[in-house]
């Protein structure tokens, strides 16, 4: 079903530091947040699917249950549901788990400063080809502009990264500027599920070691509905400013109470050096910011 998009007036931008987040040396990520294994997303079969532009690709649970992943949509342009989220973005935007970059490219086309991050080299390369800017890193790695981003996106199920919504919300709070906006896509039922899954393309044997040599290839993941996300968010000082459904996809916009203090582990601004120029520079290192042409 398709829901009606609520009035955007509830998303009046809060006063923010207007400096762009790319003017600060990234500091270490929060030491209390576990860093999940990112290897499965950086190699086959995810990379194969992105190169081909289509699936099949699934998250396979240990009991054999399959969650189809919409690779074709990810590799296409931003659709109406995506645009319903992008229209709400404020200030510079960080897209966590940007995949092949459709959202970053659309934001750039609309004049937003936007950066995608993804652990997949193939995803980052695809983002660059579409005209977006991307960095090959995990959300739990040190990132440029921590505490400066106007909006953080967790779309396409990325609220499930690491299998720990509470920890991911803590990390997101570190990345956002005071009063910044988190836009997350949830799942339609009231689900609060934490599982171990592996990537599966329907062709390779679902059991045994994966092709990376990283054990059995399973990693933690979460699937949560809007009520569950709000339950996780409330103790951390987040409050909902918008909820809507577009083309059957539910979204939530959250803002964190400015009075809730986030402990920053970023380098001292006064002693930091620029890691990205006013236009994201072209780099080729897997640890460096990357920009499209």
For each of these PLM feature ranges, what is it?
Residues 120:
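Conserved SAM/SAH-binding beta-strand->alpha-helix loop
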Residues 140-151:
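A short acidic, Gly/Pro-enriched loop at the edge of an enzyme's catalytic core
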Residues 179-187:
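Conserved beta-strand signature within the Rossmann-like core of class I S-adenosyl-L-methionine
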């Amino acid at each position: 079903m398709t829901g009606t998009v609520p009035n955007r007036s509830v998303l009046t931008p809060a006063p923010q530091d207007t400096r762009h987040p790319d003017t600060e040396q990234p500091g270490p990520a929060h030491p209390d947040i576990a860093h999940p294994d990112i290897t499965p997303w950086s190699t086959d079969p995810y990379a194969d699917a992105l190169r081909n532009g289509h699936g099949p690709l699934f998250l396979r649970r240990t009991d054999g249950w399959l969650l189809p992943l919409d690779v074709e949509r990810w590799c296409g342009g931003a659709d109406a549901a995506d645009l319903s989220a992008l229209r709400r973005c404020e200030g510079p935007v960080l897209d966590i788990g940007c995949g092949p970059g459709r959202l970053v490219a659309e934001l750039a086309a609309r004049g937003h400063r936007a950066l995608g991050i993804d652990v997949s080299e193939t995803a980052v390369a695809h983002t660059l080809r579409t005209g977006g800017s991307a960095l090959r890193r995990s959300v739990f790695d040190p990132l440029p502009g921590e505490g400066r981003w106007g909006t953080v996106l967790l779309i396409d199920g990325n609220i499930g990264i690491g299998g720990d919504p509470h920890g991911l919300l803590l990390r997101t709070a570190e990345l956002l500027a005071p009063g910044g906006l988190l836009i997350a896509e949830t799942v339609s039922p009231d689900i609060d599920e934490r599982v171990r899954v592996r990537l599966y393309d329907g062709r390779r044997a679902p059991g045994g070691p994966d092709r990376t040599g990283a054990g059995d290839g399973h990693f933690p993941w979460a699937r949560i509905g809007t009520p569950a996300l709000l339950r996780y968010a409330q103790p951390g000082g987040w409050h909902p400013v918008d909820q809507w459904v577009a083309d059957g996809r539910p979204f939530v916009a959250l803002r964190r109470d400015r009075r809730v203090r986030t402990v920053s582990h970023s380098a001292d601004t006064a002693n930091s050096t620029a890691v990205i120029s006013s236009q994201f520079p072209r780099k080729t290192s897997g640890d460096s910011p990357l920009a499209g042409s």
